[in-house]
Amino acid sequence: MFKHETVLLHETVDMLEVKPDGIYVDATLGGAGHSEYLLNKLNEKGHLFAFDQDQTAIDNAKIKLADYSDKVTFIKANFRDMKEALNERGIEAVDGILYDLGVSSPQLDERERGFSYHQDAALDMRMDQEQELTAKTVVNEWSYQDLIRIFFQYGEEKFSKQIAREIERRREVKPIETTGELVDIIKTAIPAPARRKGGHPGKRTFQAIRIAVNDELGAVEDSLEKALTLIKPGGRISVITFHSLEDRITKQLFQEATKGPDLPPGLPVIPDEYKPDFKLATRKPIVPSEEELEQNNRARSAKLRVIEKIIK
């Protein structure tokens, strides 16, 4: 069964200031924890559109949320296509959107999906099982330079060159097929003193390959830009990020949206059309409480940022 500890559950939904008759979007359905809590706040006029590109997540959510079936629409799609999918269903604007950008724990834990460096499986890492590009293709066919780039940019891996060189050496002998083989390559490439500190040596490389396979950062940027155009005045967008790359994209997009155009200083009155359309709901990101961290270690790096469209 799809088990997933929902991070910042109450904070993420409560910060949306849910209207009982509003229209909401869960851009990252996953284990459906946020969706369930949000649906609980809606009356018979309210509705939730829940997106996931993983059919397993949708199938499990249909069971978990069976009591709310008249209030929720499930959409199997990448959240970068959210606006188009909503428009097709006659929805032009919504009251709130939430994102939980953590990979669902079940996906990490399902051996055959190939996300985990703890279990040996085929190199896959696709969120959408119907897409062609897999981790095996990245590892075996991408150039030495491209591997260095993704390991460094997406994994912030100090030993990117050493790992890419070892991959190149091994794949010349035979294709690299499994996560276990990749872990072995990473352990060979990273110097012993560095291997012994800072968690599993494969963590950064696996993250980098997963982001590349699923174009996660491109999807986040596309989706958030569209989300800003979907939100009604007074509506909010909540975004939970788990690593600095996604957080940087979210922070920059939100800062850009809350800035008005450059005006000469000293104007006595600023016309409405020159005022920004958005404001940050909190000055600093919200982070999990000590209590939550004790119960769920995966929440440690979570940050919640919230933006609101100003009513003019």
UniProtKB/Swiss-Prot annotation:
**BP GO annotations:** rRNA base methylation
User: What family is reported?
Assistant: Belongs to the methyltransferase superfamily. RsmH family.
| Enzyme Commission designation | 2.1.1.199
List the PANTHER family hit by this protein, alphabetically: 12S RRNA N4-METHYLCYTIDINE METHYLTRANSFERASE (PTHR11265:SF0), S-ADENOSYL-METHYLTRANSFERASE MRAW (PTHR11265)
Its ancestry begins with: Bacteria, Bacillati, Bacillota, Bacilli, Bacillales
According to UniProt, the name of this protein is Ribosomal RNA small subunit methyltransferase H
The entry's function note states:
Specifically methylates the N4 position of cytidine in position 1402 (C1402) of 16S rRNA.
Q: Which molecular-function annotation in GO is an example for this chain? A: rRNA (cytosine-N4-)-methyltransferase activity
